Amino acid sequence: MSGSFEDAIIGLMYSQVEYDARLLYKAMHRLGTDEGVLIEIIATRSPQQLTEIKQVFQREYKKDLIKYVESETSGHFKKVLVAILQCQRHDNNFPVDQNICNVEAQQLYAGGEGRWGTDEGIFTKIFASRSNMELCTIANYYQQMSGRNILDAIESEFSGDVKKLFKAIFHQAINTADYFATRLKEACSLGAPNRDKMIRIIISRSEVDLTQIKQCYFNRYKINLIDDVRKCAFDKYLSKLFCAILNRP
């Protein structure tokens, strides 16, 4: 075995947190950090999952994940990643306080569209501490107050990797399966298919929400995910493996 097929088989041998830790290490250990992998994993995993990933990372690679991220990233992108990895986010069982969410929607507006320049600190504080349910509620209040979708606001107020990270946090909070469906569509671009991304998402979500991802993919793009994957795998063994995973009920 070699190449992409080997990577996929190896990925199936790990638990989800072990696989995530391995992906994060590979994303930072090689020459040039793969920020997309950091965003995809750190923005979408629960505080409990991130805690376990940090433990596995320390055990397997003898490195503190937070310190490693600090050494391999920079600027506000680094600050947001580190804030999330502190695992201070509420879990989804945390009660949603409507008043607090309303106030924080106003704070986001005041720190972004409502002023000259952007207060990145208030965005980081809220995005790195609130549960998915709270973020969805904040997004609803933001739309009611400003008349704009918060994802559109992030698009206009930020740039680069920070923008991608903030958008990923909110997109997955609103609909995690839809977020991964869009990532898979990017990976299945016929012009430049990204097999590493395909492997990463299909393997890591195979025991989580792949059925929902397939449905979101069809709803968005009016084509079955498995058909796009067949076109882009470019390896008969990898294609068969993907099809076997995607055909599971």
What is each PLM-predicted segment?
Residues 1-249:
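Structural signature for extended repeat/solenoid scaffolds and their inter-repeat hinge/linker regions
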